[in-house]
Amino acid sequence: MKTPIELKILDSRIGSEFPLPAYATPGSAGMDLRAMIDTTLTIAPGETVLIPTGIAIHVADQGLAAVILPRSGLGHKHGIVLGNLVGLIDSDYQGPLMVSCWNRSDSPFALEIGDRLAQLVFVPVVQAQFKLVDEFDSSDRGEGGFGHSGTK
């Protein structure tokens, strides 16, 4: 299923030097976002920086949202993860997409112009309406949490 999402190019290198975000394979869930920086950026150990992607989107459909997620290789191999862990893009947001990058490793990391640094995934949204109750109906789990089911 393909849903049209409005995209605005904010950096002219997108679509010329670097491709528009796209799915790498038919089974891909996310589209790569690139670091649209002007020069190589070294992220020091423990440092967090905000990186422009060169695009803005408008999801518009209130039944959808977008999430910005880390790329697994950057986190596992280099310790580069998202500073906010997950970026949530509401359907009515129309501003630039930025990626908060946190270097949780002990080594500096050089981010190059156009590097793929995160992925954009669209997800369905359900807006809940709370129903106040005095007690919950019982369940097998009850209030058990934080490892209550064990590790094996």
From Swiss-Prot:
Pfam families, sorted: dUTPase (PF00692)
Pathway this chain belongs to: Pyrimidine metabolism; dUMP biosynthesis; dUMP from dCTP (dUTP route): step 2/2
InterPro entries referenced in this protein's UniProt entry, alphabetically: dUTPase, dUTPase-like, dUTPase-like_sf, dUTPase_trimeric
Protein's UniProt name: Deoxyuridine 5'-triphosphate nucleotidohydrolase
Catalytic reactions on record: dUTP + H2O = dUMP + diphosphate + H(+)
Keywords (A to Z) from UniProt: Hydrolase, Magnesium, Metal-binding, Nucleotide metabolism
SUPFAM superfamilies for the chain: dUTPase-like (SSF51283)
Name of the top EC class for this enzyme: hydrolase
Originating species: Shewanella baltica (strain OS155 / ATCC BAA-1091)
GO terms, biological process: dUMP biosynthetic process; dUTP catabolic process
UniProt similarity note: Belongs to the dUTPase family.
Residues reported to bind substrate: R71, S72, G73, N84, L88, I89, D90, M98
